[in-house]
Swiss-Prot record:
SUPFAM superfamilies referenced in this protein's UniProt entry, alphabetically: Eukaryotic type KH-domain (KH-domain type I) (SSF54791), Nucleic acid-binding proteins (SSF50249), Ribonuclease PH domain 2-like (SSF55666), Ribosomal protein S5 domain 2-like (SSF54211)
Requisite cofactors: Mg(2+)
KH domain: residues covered: 562-621
Major localisation: cytoplasm
PANTHER family: POLYRIBONUCLEOTIDE NUCLEOTIDYLTRANSFERASE (PTHR11252), POLYRIBONUCLEOTIDE NUCLEOTIDYLTRANSFERASE 1, MITOCHONDRIAL (PTHR11252:SF0)
Name of a matching Pfam family: RNase_PH
GO molecular function: 3'-5'-RNA exonuclease activity; magnesium ion binding; polyribonucleotide nucleotidyltransferase activity; RNA binding
Name of the molecule in the record: Polyribonucleotide nucleotidyltransferase
Keyword Protein biosynthesis applies: no
InterPro entries named among the record's database cross-references: ExoRNase_PH_dom1, ExoRNase_PH_dom2, ExoRNase_PH_dom2_sf, KH_dom, KH_dom_type_1, KH_dom_type_1_sf, NA-bd_OB-fold, PNPase
Subcellular location: Cytoplasm
Length: 721
């Protein structure tokens, strides 16, 4: 089981591709390694199914907790449903792979990437993407690769290739670029308001490294004596397509030129043309080749009709510069937006509409305990900003069962989440956990960017002090030979019939997120740069329209949102606040009707709908953690009496004891002869023993309050409004 290993080095990091050693019954397999991260990627092909008109490609990313030396925490101690990160990585594999398979291919294909070992310095996702290409080539599957992917980070002014997790967190850019010999085929990035020029430079920098990984794959194939299988389309009967071109081109073209019609009207007219054509074909002679072709496959007419519509729409854009709704290539659809559209029971809400795409976003403010723990191979910090995206069937006028979120919903939600994170306020000044939910009410293209815009409106309506508002736009592309047209703000039909879906989100100062997917085998960086630069005026225009609805975050929170106080205590005193078995902190929460969270670093966050109650809880905690010294004098209240003395609360939550011998200069027979529960007394700290117990005295202490010591009022870190 020796196998063959090819190594390539980037910035001191070595990537190793081992073939011929693992998973011998898979169509093709490769072990991708970098540092201590190991990902096994397999590609398998099986006989296609009858009657389908799409590529049945499945891409899975599997995490095994043993890869990080951990045992699952579930009852069965076994991995269960893939975590969100695994779903996103599976999409990251699928998106650059899918356009490289022949459009006519109908065989079942499955790519499985399994993370077997994880080095905390080396993310596994880009290794899985590159491995998918290598495994597919080794499996002899028709494929227009090789394809490879790398990650680019930005530390200071320097780009870093395949940065570690820590470098990603410290840097201003997290960009993944995938490409083929033909150009870039996929880009995904989160950025800290970077200028367009920096992002374009990063894509170019990454593509150079991609080319090196492509050469490594080609070298492995050559050394193994494997010839890459070139896609060869099956012979197709062109009689039906010729018939449709002759009989339908004029009527379809006329519909596409009716720029004032609605989407529903256009779809209805195209359906009518198709139905009339079907009737005409059905009236042909029984032995007519066109009729026999349609009768043999119920989907062949629909597929050929769509292909002709696509061809005519693309020709109209290339030759006339006209889109189906009459817009110019760089024109944005009509924008309307509103903030505060729901009652304030909902902490914040925003409604964003662009053309026929409409998104309702809501923002909810929560406490630190609402943060999401990341139960995956690289847990990292808890998530304190969550974005959830819902795409119900009625948004496209369809009916289907309502199910749990699929990969698409998870991916769109993650992109919108990524776009907003760079502008969120620092945790120490705004310690709320934030959840935004975007409900797609109507869809006609670019709902993910609509969700970004809706999120901004909802968060500002909720009173979240964003560093800057964020907007987003989706760019498209039509490529016919050397002719290229870039489209601004694509709608559904342009996404479906076009060659690119490029989403760009950001503020007026720069980009915060982008995602590019292709339907062709690659684009030069120069063309991508044109799309990025063309997106900027569209983003700014959309942002200006949004700011007409709300130009700054609200100055006050919803009356139904929790109020938070945040302050710091000595981490060594956390146990004092919590108490044995959590008794002390539970008593404080019950007494003040608040919710209290304490982080390991000593940051205490108190949540309550009543600001006064939160302040009371803060005073108790500060009293518990305040250091007192021998000789200090306090006014306190007798809280309980025992035979040998009395306990006095000298600070909120902090008690000391007066021994019976310290109650008076004279001999005392019974404690309650001198003091009773509820009495106000002035005491001096006589001693603090080695167990931290405070011993008090009344002897020699005047009871007129002159030597009492008052405590300053606490100053909250987070506002109470």
């Amino acid at each position: 089981m020796q196998g063959q290993t090819q190594s390539i080095s980037f910035d001191g990091r070595e990537i190793r591709l081992t073939t011929g050693r693992y998973a011998p019954q898979a169509g093709g397999s490769v072990m991708m390694e970098c540092g201590d991260t190991s990902v096994l990627v397999t590609a398998t092909r099986s006989t296609g199914r009858e009657g389908i008109d799409f590529l049945p490609l499945i891409c899975d990313y599997e995490e095994r907790l043993y890869a990080a030396g951990r045992i699952p925490g579930s009852f069965m101690r076994r991995e269960g449903r893939p975590p969100e990160r695994a779903t996103l990585i599976a999409r990251l594999i699928d998106r650059p792979m899918r356009p490289l398979f022949p459009s006519w291919m109908r065989d079942d294909l499955q790519i499985v990437a399994t993370c077997l070992s994880l080095d905390e310095r080396v993310p596994a996702d880009v290794l899985a993407v590159t491995g998918a290409s290598m495994a597919t080539l080794l499996a002899g599957i028709p494929f227009q690769g090789p394809m490879a992917a790398v990650r680019v980070g930005l530390l200071g002014d320097d780009f870093v290739l395949n940065p570690s997790y820590r470098e990603i967190e410290r840097g201003d850019l997290d960009l993944v670029v995938a490409g083929t010999p033909d150009g870039v085929v996929m880009v995904e990035a989160g950025a800290n308001q970077l200028p367009e020029g920096d992002v374009i430079e990063a894509i170019d920098f990454g593509y150079e490294a991609v080319c090196e990984l492509i050469k490594a794959q080609q070298s492995i194939l050559k050394d193994a004596g494997i010839k890459q299988v070139q896609p060869e389309p099956p012979t197709q009967d062109t009689k039906l397509s010729t018939y449709l071109e002759k009989n339908c081109s004029k009527s379809i073209g006329e519909v596409l030129k009716q720029f004032e019609q609605t989407k529903a009207e256009r779809d209805s007219k195209l359906d009518a043309i198709k139905a009339k054509t079907a009737e005409a074909i059905d009236s042909l002679k029984e032995d007519d080749a066109v009729r026999k072709s349609v009768n043999a496959n119920s989907k062949v007419l629909s597929n050929n009709f769509k292909a002709l519509t696509k061809k005519l729409m693309r020709e109209q854009i290339i030759k006339q510069g006209k889109r189906v709704d009459g817009r110019k290539l760089d024109e944005v659809r009509t924008i309307t937006s509103a903030a505060g559209v729901l009652p304030k029971r909902v902490h914040g809400s925003g409604l964003f509409q662009r053309g026929l795409t409409q998104v309702l976003s809501t923002a909810t403010l929560g406490t630190p305990s609402d943060a999401q723990e990341m139960d995956d191979l690289n847990p990292g910090p808890e998530k304190t900003y969550l974005h959830h995206y819902n795409f119900p069937p009625y948004s496209v006028g369809e009916t289907r069962p309502m199910r749990s979120p699929g990969r698409r919903e998870v991916g769109h939600g993650s992109l919108a989440e990524r776009a907003i994170i760079p502008v969120l306020p620092p945790k120490d000044t705004f310690p709320y956990v934030l959840r935004v939910v975007s409900e797609v009410l109507s869809s006609n293209g670019s709902t993910s960017m609509g969700s970004v815009c809706g999120s901004t409106l909802a968060l500002m309506d909720a009173g979240v002090p964003l560093k800057a508002p964020v907007s987003g736009a989706a760019m498209g592309l039509i490529k016919e030979d050397a002719e290229i047209r870039i489209l601004t703000d694509i709608q559904g039909i342009e996404d479906f019939l076009g060659d690119m879906d490029f989403k760009v989100a950001g503020t007026k100062d720069g980009i915060t997120a982008l995602q590019m997917d292709m339907k062709i085998t690659g684009l030069p960086v120069k063309t991508i740069a044109e799309a990025v630069n063309q997106a900027r005026p569209a983003r700014i225009h959309i942002l200006e329209k949004m700011l007409e609805a709300i130009d700054a975050p609200r100055t006050s929170l919803s009356p139904h949102a929790p109020r938070l106080l945040s302050f710091r205590i000595d981490p060594e005193l956390i146990g004092t606040v919590i108490g044995p078995g959590g008794r002390t902190i539970k008593g404080i929460t019950e007494r003040t009707n608040t919710k209290i969270d304490i982080e390991d670093g000593g940051i205490v966050t108190i949540a309550s709908h009543d600001g006064a109650a939160a302040e009371a809880a803060q005073r108790i905690i500060e009293g518990l953690t305040r250091k007192v010294n021998e000789g200090e004098v306090f006014s306190g209240t007798i809280t309980r009496i025992i035979p040998i003395g009395a306990f006095v609360e000298i600070l909120p939550g902090k008690e000391g004891m007066i021994h019976i011998s310290q109650l008076s200069e004279a001999r005392v027979e019974k404690v309650d002869d001198v003091v009773k529960v509820g009495d106000e007394v002035t005491v001096r700290i006589r001693e603090i023993d080695n167990r931290g117990r405070i011993n008090l005295t009344l002897r020699g202490v005047p009871q007129n309050g002159e030597e009492t010591q008052s405590e300053p009022a606490p100053t909250p870190v987070a506002p109470l409004n």
